[in-house]
Amino acid sequence: MNEKEDIMDNKRVLIIYTGGTIGMKATQQGYRPAPDFLDSELKSIPDLMREDFPEWELYEMYPLLDSSNMTLKEWNEIARVIYENYDRYCGFVVLHGTDTMAYTASALSFILRGLNKPVVLTGSQIPLSEIRSDGRDNLITSILIASEGVANEVCLYFSGRLLRGNRAMKMSADGLVAFKSPNYPLLAEVGIEIRYNRDAILKRGEDVKLEYLPFHEVPIGVLKVFPGIQFGLFEEIMTEKLSGIVLETFGAGNIPGGGGELLPIIKKAFSSGSVITVCSQCPMGTVTLGAYETSSSLKGAGAVSGKDMTTEAAVAKLYHLFSLELSKEEIKKMMEKNIAGELT
């Protein structure tokens, strides 16, 4: 192998296609993912076929999914493909539907412990097969980022912005700037050049070994409080059905009614082995249990603060910790500690 071939081999990227808008085909019934269709679309993009562009290979999952149908099974499968091919590629691009992309990014950040290569999730709001697709730049730039080995963590790239995967949130259903990271700075901004914010990127030692820690099926639920909520309607599911609960509260962790109806439910859920994590409905800011009287009672009842975690990250983290078969007390403790850059 000559020097040029060696360099190109080191720049090889694996593209994992899970489904989603970016590779969908127009049919009489509307857009749908179609097996083998994306491969021909990619080969028709001149920039992807240039000699000076990183070498790439396509891995197509089966079945291809609309991302609203993504489950733990698919999260584990995506991570398994990365784990089993880790030494063969310098980075990975995961093509994914936008609806649950932030959930998958969060999940991968926990399943792939010790990751020291870029894993970049991206997609599009307009299919590649359409004339005015945002997918071309998203894909091309994601491959470049994956090949450069700077942002060695699970990232999400969309419309000129590289975000930490477990800090990202989908902010627009139809806008091209669909994702933001309200509580964490950008990992990179893309204009004429890719400008990395190296201080914001996770730092890991060169000798870190990648581990594959798949999620197990665990009953997890999300409950969003609202004015007038009748907590009693949710008592059975909170106390008997769920192991982990993400409670989306007002502001910094406040609940309606002073917690009079909710607190006995939380105490009962806690005594039955559930872990209740409090996140804010606000995209920006942090949960501080005890900052207000209405949140102090939550802490006293056994709930833990999700701090500035997104709901997506909190859900994935609960799956992760329960899958490690930790005790309830260990899980409570770890929910408030940073594991993969998910909280400040």
Where are these regions (language model features)?
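Short, acidic/small-residue loops that bind anionic groups at enzyme active sites
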Residues: 105-134, 143-149, 269-280
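Short beta-strand segments
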Residues: 16-18, 94-96, 120-123, 155-159, ...
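C-terminal non-catalytic interaction/assembly regions of soluble proteins
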Residues: 252-344
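Short acidic, glycine/serine/threonine-rich loops at helix termini
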Residues: 26-29, 105-106, 131-134, 164-170, ...
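Short Gly/Thr/Asp-enriched flexible loops that form oxyanion-binding sites at enzyme active sites
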Residues: 95-117, 257-265
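ATP/NTP phosphate-donor binding region
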Residues: 2-84
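Accessory alpha-helical/coil subdomains and C-terminal extensions
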Residues: 9-10, 16-20, 38-50, 164-247, ...
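Internal gly/pro-rich beta-alpha loop/helix module
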Residues: 121-191
